[in-house]
Amino acid sequence: MLNHVYGWDDTIVALATPTGIGAIGVIRLSGTKAIDIVNELFTSKDLSKQNTHTIHVGFIKEDNVDVDEVVVSLYKNPKSYTGEDVVEIGCHGSPFVQQQVIQACIRKGARLAKPGEFTQRAFLNGKLDLTQAEAVADIISSNTAASQKTALHNMRGGFSEILKELRENLIQFSALIELELDFSQEDVEFADRKKFYELIEGATIVTKDLLQSFKLGNVIKNGVSVAIIGKPNAGKSTLLNTLLNESRAIVSEIAGTTRDTVEEIINIDGILFRLIDTAGIREHSTDVIELIGIEKTREKIKQSDEVIYLFDVNSETNEDIFTAKKLITETNKNFILVGNKMDLAGENKAAEKFAGHDIIFISAKGLLHIDILKERLVKKVVQGNINTENTIITNTRHYEALQQVFTSLADIKSGLDNHITGDLLALDIRRCLHYISEITGNISNENVLDYIFSKFCIGK
């Protein structure tokens, strides 16, 4: 096992369930002495003589004193999450009891696991590659159906299989080209250049699709920030509360009530939107607190992915709309024009007044056309339906490495077009293989691995 190479011949222990009071807590051990350590504490059965993937009920005892009645799950190597012997102890969910069990394991020879160390051992023991390991972290942090399904698809090897096939094909052709170099004086060609060209063209299309999926993947994983801007008392706080179905922001008839930005999260069709209710933009305010809020609004526009410009259809003019569009366009942000309080003016009259603009007319207070606004928000960030069965890139590290893969494939294709020599072609292939292997972890910097796994929770 590779853990011996990394000096991991010890046994680790950690709480695998969230800290705090609960019905049960699960303590996980992994390593060469996991079974022996638990055997010293669990006297009901000799776990070393039990079959893998079995469950046993009994008491944890230390110095002949009962600690807790537990359920022990046994997973013998290599058929476990880490590829090592793994024992999971299900005890009562008291933090005190959990710590008693953990400390007893440590006294018998285990050490406390580092964040992500169980998954790191699974990676180093070949139970999963680096993309799958990162998908495990994504599942743990997922907070929508779309993010969970996308991460699950990648954890099952959806992304890995694509890279594996490309890598194996490149290695096969690379070996043939390297063989040609050994017979360079005989002018023989083992690698079919036509087939290789077709392979590179296909790989380029697949890589391009993966790169293009990152925009959607980033939305699925991290959500979209939406700044709600407009003049004071346009109804921004009312709209925020309507979208959230609760009274979060202060709503008042007094202009300039929102003195600071208010942020809330809403899930619309599996996409997280971080809605930012901002202070109204009023250039000639003399209120110091309000002026600070206005400045924060400008900053939030710069930081947001989308902008909703909300205006009162009864008081604003076409000139106001043109001014607002100019302000937002200068920031290069996508925006939606939303005319509020249409119930007072009437939708037809409002549409006639602002003809020529793409505007959604609503009544935030009267709950009119809110669903239309939600649909537009989703359409702004998602083209068509989200198909989580397809491989979607959500990780910036993968995206950056795939850009290098795409560039390398272009270099290989250019080399084939220009009939470059085999040695130069082999260099381009090796470069491409390097970046593919960097994604999957076939070659990895130890510092990179430590950084990736440090983001996991302890116990995973």
Features from the language model and the residues they span:
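Switch I (G2) and immediately adjacent beta-strands of P-loop GTPase domains
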Residues: 57-76, 256-285
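Glycine-rich, N-terminal phosphate-binding loop of Rossmann-like dinucleotide-binding domains
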Residues: 93, 243, 278, 311-314
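A glycine-rich (often HGG/GG-containing) alpha/beta subdomain
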Residues: 1-149, 153, 157, 331, ...
